[in-house]
Amino acid sequence: MTPSLARQIESPVRRLRLRVRGAVQGVGFRPFAYRLARAMRLSGFVLNDSAGVLIEIEGRDANHFPEAVRTQAPPLARIDSIDVLELVPAGGERFEILESLGGRSATRIGADAATCDGCRRELTDPASRFFGYPFVNCTHCGPRFTITRALPYDRAHTSMASFPMCRTCAADYVDPENRRFHAEPVACPNCGPRLSHPIKEISARLEGGAIVALKGVGGFHLLCDARNDGAIGLLRLRKAGDQKPFAVMVRDIEAARQLARPNEAEEALLISPARPIVLVAARAGELSGLIAPGLTRVGLMLAYAPVHHLLLDELSRSSPHCHAALVATSANPGGEPLVADNDDAGRRLVAIADLVVTHDRDIVVRADDSVMQVIDGAPAFIRRARGFVPEPVDLGADGPSVIATGADLKNTICVTRGREAFLSQHIGGLDNAEAIRFQREVIAHLCSILDVKPEFAACDLHPDFRSVRTAEGLNLPIVPVQHHLAHVAAVVADDRLSGPVLGLALDGHGFGTDGTSWGGEIVVIDHHRWQRAGSLMPLPLPSGDRAAREPWRMGVAALQAAGRIDLAPQLWPGHSGVTQLTAMFSGSMPTPVTSSLGRLFDAAAAIAGVRLVQDYEGQAAMEFEALVRAPRCLAGGYSIGDGTLDFRPLILHLAEQGRPCGADAADVFHGTLIAGLADWAARGAAARGTRQVALGGGCMMNRVLAAGLARALRERGLEPSLPRLAPANDGGIALGQPAYARQVIMNEHASIEENRTCA
């Protein structure tokens, strides 16, 4: 028998249908399948439809095709599943890309991706028609989520629909060997979007100390020279005295290394297609001290859009011995959502920026830059937005579709579909009308691109939250989920934990089931059941929300709780507010209380003299963390009894030092917190027969505390889980709400079915 005859006997012609689900539209999947099928001499077709990508292939090597798809998929593709069905061979010699089919969407689009190496080379190649073109893209990079109105992901459903392709781009689009084969946003200077100002003019204005508002992928940035104190000071002044840390954009990883000391994990994040802002250790003297006052870490990001590359290239030519660096902060005047519309920018940014640079490609839905850091050796979100949305979180099981409206601070929303949870981009504080409008836009857009009609709504317990009003306005059955339960449930969903899980919910404030302010809780979750199993020793909360803005108030309150309010005048001599507050505590007027770890941080920072008044949320705790050298535990610095963890001995120790060195106080405070929380969790876990400990809440953004606590728990034989797929702060609440609500809904449904059966 000849080898060719043997091969024909062993490998008969087969026809297979592949249903590919996941982030497989808008990432070059169809041209990839086309080229792969041609290389394997297979006939058939590929198309996008409402369920993902459908492929039919026929030939002698058809059985090898599914594995090749799985292992060789395009870099931006995320394959969730490949279902294979064998069909009767139909013949044919060609493999074709067919038009997309409509219908209900059960797939998703990819996130926006940073400029790839190929497009980056074309930007600087005088022989390329994309030379110097600020909107170059291909199947491996460019905007996706922020330009898409609906699925399937085709040009007609994006903001590129208003830019008909020129003859050359159209030829690239239909050429299977071209990197822009079926790249929906493909465009060139002859047919695509245009920038309102030349790159050289923008660069010259920045070099001259100007503030520039630049429209990018998900909205406008406010830019200025990161080494110019005058420009940065003016930017802060024009942003109504905003003192929050600014992010810095640089051209490449070499520039990042000049300004900071990123470790391997941080560099991997910096160069990833998502291009988030990454918090890294700053090098002294390389940047203006006005960028991140009082902090030792700086938020860096690499250029991710062609316009960024062109601008930083031009600036670098002017300073060849010094890497160009730009402050790049969100254009969100007055704390309102990010500006993304040209007309809106003309109204709202002219008082801040000396130059407003626009382009004519509409941003369908705005998205801030994502912000990340590395905690305990792995990435963690501070803000999840551009580059990651709308990638889902796998909940591990099917369930009803739930929409969650999140918290009132750092608001996000979440929609579940099947076994997936889709957390929205960062919306922000719901304390203004523009934010409420943005939240409605996000809800409508996310439900549209997912083609989902939620069956239930989940929201916070707080009776005055605007996010609760949003849920009530959806006219759906509502499942309320307590704030700290949601923090822990988010980590449970994130790490796919099951069975009883002991959670530590550590944050600034959340409305408790008893009507008091919680924020330092042990929460035990077992599917649809939960219990508050412990809390920090409550402290007085004088003047309510003012205590969160003025840490000195919490300092006085902590001394009152420790029985040494007499130390207050010594720590803050001549402070009239301290005198008044001390007198108030001496009276009979009742004061609300809080078990919040965030407020305990404020108290300690004030007692240590780090900060008495905050310019932004979390400032005192962030500056206190920045002082830590080596955490150490104070012997006898805490006690545990009846599920309550009491740090009053630690507070008393700090106060009795008079005014200790800030670094000494930070070391002792963080070290004692870590030891106390670890012991507290270990006792609680042992009492409930579990080793799983979920660590949630905004305090878990403190790298020293989170990493130290995770390490201490592992040393005690426990299995800690930190937030990874959603922020630890209130930006992750919207993931925990539907994750827990679905457990409640499915349990109630099961109970109803059981009762019907028994009847």
Curated annotation (Swiss-Prot):
One of its GO terms (biological process) is protein maturation. It catalyses: C-terminal L-cysteinyl-[HypE protein] + carbamoyl phosphate + ATP + H2O = C-terminal S-carboxamide-L-cysteinyl-[HypE protein] + AMP + phosphate + diphosphate + H(+). It is an enzyme of class 6 (ligase). Keywords: Ligase, Metal-binding, Zinc, Zinc-finger. Residues 15-99 form the Acylphosphatase-like domain. Gene3D superfamilies: 3.30.110.120, 3.30.420.360, 3.30.420.40, 3.90.870.50. Pfam families: Acylphosphatase, HypF_C, HypF_C_2, Sua5_yciO_yrdC, zf-HYPF. One of its GO terms (molecular function) is carboxyl- or carbamoyltransferase activity. Its EC number is 6.2.-.-. Coiled coil: none annotated. The keyword Isomerase does not apply. A zinc finger (C4-type) spans 116-141, 166-191. Residues 196-387 form the YrdC-like domain. Pathway: Protein modification; [NiFe] hydrogenase maturation. The keyword Zinc applies. SUPFAM superfamilies: Acylphosphatase/BLUF domain-like, YrdC/RibB. Belongs to the carbamoyltransferase HypF family. Involved in the maturation of [NiFe] hydrogenases. Along with HypE, it catalyzes the synthesis of the CN ligands of the active site iron of [NiFe]-hydrogenases. HypF functions as a carbamoyl transferase using carbamoylphosphate as a substrate and transferring the carboxamido moiety in an ATP-dependent reaction to the thiolate of the C-terminal cysteine of HypE yielding a protein-S-carboxamide. This is Carbamoyltransferase HypF. It comes from Rhizobium leguminosarum bv. viciae.
